[in-house]
């Protein structure tokens, strides 16, 4: 048995399905909170690999734009409030202010983290030093 626990997270990105065809601008919300489980107790995040689909143009131009992942957890089994509408600026501070105790840390994915194939961009980044994910003791079903 491996000493590592691998989690595959597939966030819901619905801009095209929702009729939002505009390109994302710097600082806009790509997707809202996406839950996933880690083993109970503290779990050190070692790294992230992200697969980014190409643009929908005729040349299948790859997307290699830096982005940041935000990590948060539930409190009393209640998830943080929404980050905001997709393809828009994040929610106003007043809307998320009561949820800052759920925030764990952010992880930047920078331009140098990307490798490119003809049809796909893949970014692999090491987690920031000391990044530990720990859910509520009474949540989840992983031991």
Tell me what each language-model feature is.
Residues 1-143:
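Surface-exposed, low-hydrophobicity beta-strand/loop segments enriched in small/polar/acidic residues
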């Amino acid at each position: 048995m491996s000493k590592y626990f691998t989690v595959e997270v597939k966030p819901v990105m619905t801009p095209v399905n929702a009729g939002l065809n505009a390109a994302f601008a710097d600082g806009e919300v790509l997707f809202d909170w996406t839950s996933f489980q880690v083993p109970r107790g503290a779990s050190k995040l070692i790294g992230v690999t992200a697969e980014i689909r190409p643009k929908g143009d005729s040349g299948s131009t790859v997307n290699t734009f830096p982005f940041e992942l935000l990590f948060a957890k539930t409190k009393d089994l209640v998830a943080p409030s929404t980050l905001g509408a997709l393809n828009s600026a994040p929610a106003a501070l007043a809307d998320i202010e009561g949820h800052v105790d759920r925030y764990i840390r952010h992880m930047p994915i920078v331009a140098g983290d990307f490798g490119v194939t003809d049809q796909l961009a893949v970014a692999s980044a090491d987690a920031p030093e000391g990044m530990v994910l720990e859910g509520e003791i009474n949540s989840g079903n992983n031991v």
